[in-house]
Amino acid sequence: EEIIDVAYQSPEMEVGFNVSYLLDVLNTLKCERVRFNLVDASSSCLIEDCDNSTAEYVIMPMRL
């Protein structure tokens, strides 16, 4: 289990991801900051580089 710092301004939610999929995306982006676009804890998550949105990745959360 990893806990990361986020800038989040909406109601609290808990979401989990398969670490292999998440690491694949993060290793591909190779940037300092990423943006996770979430609607709710069960919908797909769009991940992109904060400074360059030319590449977008979608991963599905796991049920907790």
UniProtKB/Swiss-Prot annotation:
GO terms for cellular component: cytoplasm; DNA polymerase III complex. Coiled coil: none annotated. Keywords: Cytoplasm, DNA replication, DNA-binding, DNA-directed DNA polymerase, Nucleotidyltransferase, Transferase. It is found in: Cytoplasm. Signal peptide: none annotated. The keyword Cytoplasm applies. GO terms for biological process: DNA strand elongation involved in DNA replication. One of its GO terms (molecular function) is DNA binding. Belongs to the beta sliding clamp family. Confers DNA tethering and processivity to DNA polymerases and other proteins. Acts as a clamp, forming a ring around DNA (a reaction catalyzed by the clamp-loading complex) which diffuses in an ATP-independent manner freely and bidirectionally along dsDNA. Initially characterized for its ability to contact the catalytic subunit of DNA polymerase III (Pol III), a complex, multichain enzyme responsible for most of the replicative synthesis in bacteria; Pol III exhibits 3'-5' exonuclease proofreading activity. Forms a ring-shaped head-to-tail homodimer around DNA which binds and tethers DNA polymerases and other proteins to the DNA. The DNA replisome complex has a single clamp-loading complex (3 tau and 1 each of delta, delta', psi and chi subunits) which binds 3 Pol III cores (1 core on the leading strand and 2 on the lagging strand) each with a beta sliding clamp dimer. Additional proteins in the replisome are other copies of gamma, psi and chi, Ssb, DNA helicase and RNA primase. This is Beta sliding clamp.
